[in-house]
Amino acid sequence: ITGYLSTAGGSTAEETAGNEEDAAGNEEDAAGNEGDITGNEEDEDAGQNEETAETVRAYGFELSDQSGNIHTLEQYEGKVIFLNFWATWCGPCRNEMPEIQKLYEEYAAQGEDAEVAILGVAGPGMGGEGSAEDITAFMEENSYTYPVLMDETGEMFSYYGISAFPTTFMIDREGNVFGYVSGQLTEDIMRSIIDQTLAAN
């Protein structure tokens, strides 16, 4: 998985705090790195130093989804979390949502024994996004049923330093950030990053 694990809750989040436009990003940025999990030289260096990198705790969220259900980080303890940040106006986001729904249905069918939780995150009113009601209507119109957390304050977007859509973070079983990928993902890549995170601990 590409990405500097130590920046997820550090300077990147601080630089983007309160900046809704940066948090929203744009479709070109999101599509520019579609599913690249190979990274560049800097990413490779980061991977080599992964063992010595500081562990970054996942954001301790308590947010409601499109159905009004409350979700917390603690309730997913012991599970890997596939955390997908997206927007209704984002073309690459729309393109990958059927695959995310497919994975959600697959893991949901396993019930309490499922090792993986699939969650979306949207920012109502941020960067051109509509209201929570608009996001819910979009999900219903497209028959998407996986939970989408409504980050009304933008705190979760800020913590993870979201600057383009879609961006997917993987959270390990211990509630720590394993890594992230920016750009549209294929189903194969989604399964690959899930497997990588499952194997981590």
Residue ranges and their predicted role:
Residues A53-T55, G60-I81, E105-Y107:
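A short beta-strand-turn-helix
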Residues F61, Y76, F85-W86, F138, ...:
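Conserved hydrophobic/aromatic "anchor" residues
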Residues M170-N201:
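Thiol-/selenol-based redox modules, centered on thioredoxin-like
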Residues I1-A58, N201:
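N-terminal targeting signals for export/organelle localization
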Residues E112-G130, T145-T153:
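Thiol-based oxidoreductase modules, predominantly thioredoxin-like and allied folds used
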Residues K79-V80, N95-A122, E140, E187, ...:
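Conserved helix-turn-beta segment immediately C-terminal to the redox Cys motif
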